[in-house]
Amino acid sequence: MNQTNAHATNRTVHDADSHITESGGWMEDYASEYVKSNLDKPFIDLENIPQLKPIFEQAKNRLAGNDPELTERLKSDLYGNPGKRNLMAAYGAVDGEERRDSLDIAGINSQIVFPGLVFFSRFANSKDPKVVYGGSEAMNRAMVDFCAADSRRLLSVGYLPLKDPALSLESAKQAIEMGVKSFWLRSDAVEGRAPSHVAYDPIWALLEEAGVPIVLHIGS
């Protein structure tokens, strides 16, 4: 049965919580040399866990175009193929064009696309503002690039650090110009300031004017 047959027609479906899976070196491709050399190591290096190595190697091989049969199996059975559970191996997990196609298959009109946990583990906790804001810029560019396959339907979520209100305002302006459609904020206090602190009011005014929402994950 065609996978889209189960979806009713004349209905708008919006996926409000999707993520990408970041492969090794994903962020480094967008970062300056300074940021690259000062990124923290991932708190979980998935690709070097012995049990997961075969999955990642298979995924890399497929994404390089060396296993079209596997790609077709994943695509033709988007919901049922066991490969969908295997992080990077899933169809559309790391490739924007595959993600766009997966929306068509699933009958989804649009999708908010979050990063994984790369920002928490690589730069957001750095004591160096250059790394925090440079890392944020790199990740935001990577997210916009992923969603460029169909930026009308794939809505990129960037990260907005709140370490320094003035730098955060410039970071928000830059990311909006890039094409970031929403910002993920940390819900806890940063430098003793909650997100509701008046020092951030110019940022909220900018986002309101641009029509760019913020999202929070309480407790993280």
Task: Show where each model-derived region lies.
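Helix-coil boundary/capping segments in enzymes
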Residues: 1-220
